[in-house]
Amino acid sequence: MTTILYIEDNEDNIFLFTRRLSKKGYDVIIARDGEAGVSMARSERPSLILMDLDLPVVDGWEATRLLKASPETEHIPVIAVSAYAMAEDRRRALEAGCDDFFAKPVDMKALFAKIETLQSDGTDK
């Protein structure tokens, strides 16, 4: 089963995303801040990470940089999922190392398609 780490501090988003992802057959684990997310990624080795950008403790941009700088986690795809919707926000997320960027509210069909593409591309290591 594909395990997705969802790093998000908003309980409503956690509930909605976990429900939708679980219905699609994904195993979802949650971290509620960037620091906990980096730690969990290192210990759990998820297949993919969904990363909010506006997080407490360590923001999503820095958490992504930390993940991509570590040999343990650099191969794990990171998709930014954020209320930040400007082109500059997308650029910053991609520069930090995110593999893609989705603005909230998220088109779930497009997100699921991206997850499937990343998994079938062999990035699920």
What are these regions (language model features)?
Residues 8, 32:
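Conserved acidic carboxylate
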Residues 15, 106-116:
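C-terminal output helix
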Residues 44-50, 55:
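Active-site beta3 strand of CheY-like receiver
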Residues 56, 74, 86:
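The feature encodes the CheY-like receiver
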Residues 15-23:
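Charged docking surfaces used in two-component/phosphorelay signaling
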Residues 86, 102-103:
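Residues at the ends of beta-strands that form strand-to-helix hinge/output surfaces
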